[in-house]
Amino acid sequence: MADARKAALDTALKKIEKNFGKGAIMRMGDAAQTTISTISSGSLALDDALGVGGYPRGRIVEIYGPESSGKTTVALHAVAEVQKQGGTAAYIDAENALDPVYAEHLGVNIDDLLLSQPDTGEQGLEIADALVSSGAVDILVVDSVAALVPRAEIEGEMGDAHVGLQARLMSQALRKLSGTLNKTKTIALFINQIREKVGVMFGNPETTPGGRALKFYATIRLEVRRAEQIKEGTNIIGNRVRIKVVKNKVAPPFKRAEVDIMYGQGISQTGEIVDMAAEKDIVKKSGSWYSYGDDRIGQGRENAKKYLDEHPDVMAEIRQKVRDAYGMDQTGEEDDQADDKSKDKATKPSDKSQAQAKPKKPVATETSLDLDDSKTDK
């Protein structure tokens, strides 16, 4: 009986491959899909909260929150990180509000950044689809979903009712994009705004525009909110921002990261290093004083940050210890071994695919993926 079932299965598999092509169906052990490639978010604290060391490649990420909370800053840091490691980034600026000077201060190479400011939502999403389909883009940012206005609404009169147009547009676009993103291993970052439901008496009245499709298709959803202001005397020089991982299909969700977003500078690297080093006792905190080894580096958090800014050698040393303590550098030999194992299992690739498999640019790292999505919110 067992042999008959096996023969029937083999016949079915051969028929599927004949009708739909080789690779249409395979055993997961043969496909070697047990690892997921990631790109750093540009923030150590956020990389740790994401659980896999960054944004997973080939997936959709939604970043939402109130106005001026730091959503665009978080996205631009990911763009800068991709470019820093030799990747290509594209930015769909539907809001027509991207500040190139600020982006450059965050480390974005604006000369190489692909920028589009579409007239309609349909045009913006078609451009996004074309860029992703090319297979040459590592990260695509759409800023923002709320600004992807359907053509019918733009060409219509003020006051005309256009119920559900944007939701249908997003649903159709995401159905097309999700498969292409997975094949090309492009990260799609969708920035979104917040709206309030009218008449909600109990529960959270907040919602995001664009319908439910993005909530379902997103592998990761990040909620970005200002926690408090950062002051220097009476001057406000930045904001303390909380980033909550509301949904995560590749690691446990609901983790949080707190970062300092300084005006004109973006996420403070020294701020997160001070916090993370203190949490692991790499930097000792006694009262209001911070100490590293036998040296006191500052009284109060802001003074400790200034010390690290002024001593880049100490900063680099502590940063490396933080990465080691949080397990962020365990991608070298282990990933090479994983690649070797997957090559042994897979069919011998062509010369072209072998060239693509070589690590020409260290844009991505790989992390083990828990394939059981039943524990996560889909």
From Swiss-Prot:
Function: Can catalyze the hydrolysis of ATP in the presence of single-stranded DNA, the ATP-dependent uptake of single-stranded DNA by duplex DNA, and the ATP-dependent hybridization of homologous single-stranded DNAs. It interacts with LexA causing its activation and leading to its autocatalytic cleavage.
Binding site for ATP: G65, P66, E67, S68, S69, G70, K71, T72
Subcellular location: Cytoplasm
Cellular-component GO terms for this entry: cytosol
CDD domains attached to this UniProt entry: RecA
PROSITE patterns cross-referenced by the UniProt entry: RECA_1, RECA_2, RECA_3
Pfam family, one: RecA
Region (Disordered): 325-378
Key word Nucleotide-binding present: yes
Superkingdom of origin organism: Bacteria
Protein name: Protein RecA
Principal cellular location given in the protein's record: cytoplasm
Keywords: ATP-binding, Cytoplasm, DNA damage, DNA recombination, DNA repair, DNA-binding, Nucleotide-binding, SOS response
Family: Belongs to the RecA family.
MF (Gene Ontology): ATP binding; ATP hydrolysis activity; ATP-dependent DNA damage sensor activity; damaged DNA binding; single-stranded DNA binding
Gene3D superfamilies named among the record's database cross-references: P-loop containing nucleotide triphosphate hydrolases (3.40.50.300)
Basic and acidic residues bias spans: 339-351
One BP annotation, GO: DNA recombination
